[in-house]
């Protein structure tokens, strides 16, 4: 029986990107699945028991880089078993209108699936990802934040501190790292505002010239 690590995964992005992401991570199960992000080879998945010895283990290592399903899961997902996590929150953020924020919660065996978060971030670089975990049995916790497909920040701490400092994040966790699409949108809005101000100034200058010429 493993120690269970509790996890929260919060993903934010443009509605179109988020629709594609949710469709991929949930697959056919309507729940977040590690296997939907990083697929275990069917040959290993269908094995009735671990194949750790002999020719079969060697063949599996040559083909898949792992002796059996357990070895593959730990190396690729970072945890022993797949998860089956339902969406616990799906909203449009009031802080950044037009962005969809989806949250999942789930338990994983022994460790958080950090490798899966890396793959998700790289596959969907226009999204923001916040992932946190708390494993009280071995007394560790932490969180990761991703932007532009890359790890922006990671914090590791003991379970007690982590439980109260990051496991229940507020909407403002994403305030300081908007996605590239949001940055571009804000950039365009700023350019439009600047051009509008310039047009007003030009019109006022022309009006002043007309008055001076009367």
What is each residue range found by the language model?
Residues 1-214:
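Intrinsic low-complexity, intrinsically disordered or marginally ordered coil/linker segments
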